[in-house]
């Protein structure tokens, strides 16, 4: 009788505690699996970002790239306007500049919205500097025969770029977009 009672108690305790023990083991396994896959994803992401940073370095050091803006803003604190025209670009190629961008002229409101659509065969004071976040590229170009514009690219190693165009007569205009390689 004692044996029967002992076997019954053991059986009932196994029935009641078995799923709990199995569930705890399954949670531990799932947690370990999650940490493993999370670490693997983090490693793959770090590898992709390092590869992309190398690609950006190559593009900047070649001095041949294309800037595709996605937004424009008059500085300081102008309204941010999104750009949807695929023809708005800046090409820097072998010491020359080809530009097609909207631009704000005027010192006080109302500002005029004009199009910088020109090219110049020579740019001057070309300076490339590596920073903590990526690269800074600056140069000067004379557009429309007499007006000197300063171009400042802030190129981020994890994607994206900012272009600020300044002129002696007008407020700076800032563009945000992407940098790509010219083939």
Give the residues covered by each predicted segment.
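Mature extracytoplasmic domains of secretory-pathway proteins
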Residues: 89-130, 134
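Short solvent-exposed loop/turn micro-motifs enriched in small/polar/acidic residues
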Residues: 81-84, 121, 144-147
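Helix-rich interaction surfaces within compact, conserved domain-sized segments
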Residues: 32-33, 124-183
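Bacterial Sec-dependent N-terminal signal peptides
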Residues: 1-33
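Short, low-complexity, polar/charged sequence segments that are solvent-exposed and flexible
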Residues: 84-90, 118-119, 156-161, 182-183
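N-terminal secretory signal peptides
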Residues: 32-108
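A short, polar/proline- and glycine-enriched secondary-structure boundary/capping micro-motif
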Residues: 78-79, 108-113, 172-178
